[in-house]
């Protein structure tokens, strides 16, 4: 079981996944984009999304695919903080290549995708996220259109406490007793 949690930047995805990992014991794969930005800012080279969006999206796509393959042997559920769909959506937007072409032959996630809505009260720009809330909304709307077109069923997270969100996710995915 490979579950994708995606949606609006600053929607609380990473914090929610931290709860699912630490409190509920699930394996979690961290967001590829943030890992890439940290590496570049640390001097490891590579593309930043605000300087080279196509190069960044290509790197995020490769990292997301490597992440998926790295946990392919794990039989327990695994949660992904963003992933192939996010990177492919960004690459399609910035390059004009159809997303279906980008994803052709790449692994898929489980049909139900957890979708974080825009949450302005949580959104913060920082050294790793330089874009503003308007850009985050545009990305959210692109993902909202792409998911059903690719055959995924998105389930929108409620704007509730972290523990209530974690319970909602587990219930929505049938992972509770």
Describe the predicted segments one by one.
Residues 9:
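The conserved Walker
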Residues 22-63:
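Conserved substrate/cofactor phosphate-moiety recognition/catalytic segment
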Residues 5:
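Hydrophobic anchor at the beta1->P-loop junction of P-loop NTPases
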Residues 16, 20:
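Hydrophobic positions on the alpha1 helix immediately C-terminal to the Walker A/P-loop
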Residues 95-160:
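A glycine- and Lys/Arg-enriched "phosphate-lid" helix/loop adjacent to the NTP-binding pocket
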Residues 57-108, 123:
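Glycine-rich phosphate-binding loop used to anchor ATP phosphates in small-molecule kinases
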């Amino acid at each position: 079981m490979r579950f994708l949690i995606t949606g609006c930047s600053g929607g609380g995805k990473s914090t929610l996944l931290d709860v699912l990992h630490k409190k509920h014991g699930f394996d979690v794969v961290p967001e590829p984009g943030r890992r890439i930005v940290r590496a570049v800012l640390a001097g490891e080279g590579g593309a930043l999304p605000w300087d080279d969006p196509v190069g960044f999206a290509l790197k995020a796509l490769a990292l997301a695919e490597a992440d998926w393959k790295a946990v392919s042997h794990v039989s327990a559920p695994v949660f992904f903080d963003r992933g192939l769909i996010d990177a492919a959506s960004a690459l399609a937007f910035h390059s004009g290549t159809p997303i279906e072409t980008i994803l052709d032959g790449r692994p898929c996630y489980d049909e139900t995708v957890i979708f974080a809505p825009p949450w302005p009260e949580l959104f913060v720009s920082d050294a790793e996220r330089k874009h503003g809330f308007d850009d985050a909304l545009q990305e959210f709307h692109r993902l909202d259109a792409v998911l059903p077109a690719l055959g995924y069923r998105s389930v929108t997270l409620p704007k509730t406490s972290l523990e209530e969100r974690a319970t909602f996710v587990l219930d929505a995915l049938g992972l509770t007793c």
